[in-house]
A protein has these predicted regions:
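Glycine-rich phosphate/diphosphate-binding loops and the adjacent beta-loop-alpha structural elements
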Residues: 25-38
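Conformationally flexible catalytic loops at phosphate/diphosphate-handling active centers
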Residues: 1-21, 172-176
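General beta-strand structural signal in soluble alpha/beta enzymes
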Residues: 30-31, 55-58, 89-90, 132-134, ...
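Active-site diphosphate/adenylate-binding microenvironment
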Residues: 164-250
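Thiamine diphosphate
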Residues: 83-95, 213-288
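Redox- and metal-dependent alpha/beta enzyme cores, enriched for Fe-S-associated oxidoreductases
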Residues: 38-58, 201-204
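Glycine-rich phosphate/diphosphate-binding loops that line cofactor/substrate pockets in enzymes
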Residues: 13-27, 47, 195-202, 245-251
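Glycine-rich, acidic loop regions that bind phosphate or pyrophosphate groups
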Residues: 57-163
Length: 288
């Protein structure tokens, strides 16, 4: 079987994006489903570090960039989209929640993906000043090459200062959350995340099917975290975990699910399948 070449970006659109990135003082990249393919995280990590581009993994389905990357600014978009002058959306159907977040009305918004406007969605109301169709990793690699030819942006130092402040704030929030959680008689999600992070190994695969404090988990390697896809629906986590264990029998799989998600995942047949096929998974059920 001869596989077709993946779609690449339109040169004119890529040049337009290159201009906007060079001129942006407060750009931000928001990823949702990016990181599925091998090499995706390396491509984005290289782009972000070489060209001073902050990255947010908002409600991520995969790890788009290592969690310890110097340009990773966390998992929430609120304050960042409010101040950004350029928002680059990569493989994300909902880069922010309009009822909770108010982007800068003067910001340019760019959507990147195989179908950047998600044309099969009945309704989707997010602004778009530029849509670039193509396999996202190829678009980002093309942007990297185009920016390298231009030379550094005059705003690199300003971007670095913004990122340093964002990362320091995220660390402070995480420390306070864990300290507060440690004093409570019942476990809360920050405490569960803190304990899970201390117990898991670098090769463990973690599935989350609930709103979870991702900033308290370390994922320095790509392909170690899997979050709920909009195509899944409630109950996806158990089946996903079984599939991951089947594909990776030598790696530990940890599923973190809410009690409702657990029940919708048909736990009785799920655990019977695990037993019958010798596919042990660790399931953490959160009463949320």
């Amino acid at each position: 079987v001869v596989r077709p070449a993946p779609p690449g970006p339109d040169p004119a659109a890529l040049e337009q994006l290159t201009d906007w990135v060079t001129d942006a003082a407060r750009p931000v990249i928001i990823c949702g489903g990016y990181g599925q393919r091998a090499g995706d995280a390396d491509t984005l990590a290289r782009l972000a570090e070489k060209h001073a581009l902050p990255v947010i993994a908002y409600r991520p389905r995969h790890s788009p960039i290592p969690s310890d990357h110097p340009w990773h600014i966390g998992f929430e978009v609120g304050a960042h989209v409010k101040s950004a002058d350029l928002i680059i959306v990569v493989d994300s159907d909902a880069p922010w929640l309009p009822q909770l977040h108010t982007p800068n009305p003067d910001a340019r918004v760019v959507h990147i993906g195989a179908d950047p406007l998600l044309s099969d969605y009945v309704m989707r109301n997010f602004p778009s000043h530029l849509g670039i169709t193509g396999q996202s990793s190829l678009v980002l690699a093309g942007l990297d090459a185009a920016l390298s030819e231009r030379g550094p942006s005059p705003y690199v130092a300003k971007r670095r200062k913004t990122v340093d402040a964002a990362q320091a704030n995220l660390r402070e929030i995480g420390t306070k959350e864990v300290q507060t959680a440690s004093k409570k008689s019942l476990s809360t999600t920050p405490w569960i995340a803190h304990c899970l992070n201390a117990a898991k190994g670098p090769e463990d695969l973690v599935v989350t099917e609930m709103v979870f404090p991702m900033h308290l988990l370390d994922f320095p390697e790509p392909g170690c975290h899997f979050g709920l896809s909009p195509a899944g629906g409630l109950g996806w986590g158990l089946g996903e975990s079984i599939g991951l264990k089947l594909a990776n029998p030598d790696r530990r799989v940890i599923a973190v699910v809410g009690d409702g998600s657990y029940m919708f995942g048909n736990p009785t047949p799920a655990h019977f399948v695990c037993e019958a096929l010798a596919l042990p998974i660790l399931t953490i059920i959160v009463n949320n």
